[in-house]
Amino acid sequence: VYAVSAYAPITNLDAADMAYEWSYKGITSFNKVTMGQGELPQANVGGNTAPPQRTMQRVNLNADDVAYSNSLSEHFPEYVNNLQLHDSMGRVLKLDKNGNGTFKNYVKAFIIDAANKAQAKGTDLSKHTYLVRDNKTGTIKDINWEAYNRFVSRSKAPGAFDSRSNDSGENNLFGTSTTDNNHFTITAALHDTTPNQDVYVENAKIVTMMNPMNYLGSPAATNARYYRIRYGTADSNTSVAIPLIVGARAQNLGYNVDMATPFDVDHSGDYDLDELFNWMDNIV
């Protein structure tokens, strides 16, 4: 593989549940978008397809969900610190036990940069009350992290990827010819809420193969040298930390990484094709 273009990547699944709660811990009520399992797009009169019908469900977390969220988020700093990532200036990206530190500032810097670029283009930012402005210049100098995550809001319950009820799309991803859905983390298996007493964690080799973090820098792998990663600031399908972790690892290895968090963009892709094509032209 010569180059990678990734829009809103759902990846690093082993750590994604922890990262999600690092972002959304404390948000106990949210809207969950649902659609019928196996539902196909509906054709319209013109012959084109329309997206599947989706419904909005209001979800309120119970005390057990909140406790699970807290537990997951508490383990995220250890994961981040063990990665030993650093930014472009060589600063080590770390978190303390409360989830604060240079890594959090690193993530915030991408959102701040995106907001300033949007403002420079004339975008009305008045609804984004989590933004902190410089009183003299009017530029965005910081964000209120908790307020930002409340604004975006979670769209998944704790155990966002390895669901405790073993029914997420990612659980299905790790299914086998005999079992539709499987857990892929020990944590979710230990906290499984289904009546099934034979809780099965999918083969560790398969879980490893699904995570690019296990191959970036591995002598057993040949890595792409060019990466373009985009994850919108309004996207809650994973934590914004996840794609930035992958990009930082690639950058630390000396690869060419173009990484950004387009402002107020939800879970989508191909929204900046001119920029994408220019990037492609410049790396060949």
Language-model features: locations:
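Active-site-adjacent alpha-helix of alpha/beta-hydrolase-fold enzymes
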Residues: Y20-N82, T222, G232-N256
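C-terminal subdomain of alpha/beta-hydrolase-fold enzymes, centered on the catalytic histidine
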Residues: G101-V284
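Primarily recognizes the serine-hydrolase "nucleophile elbow" in alpha/beta-hydrolase
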Residues: V1-I27, V207
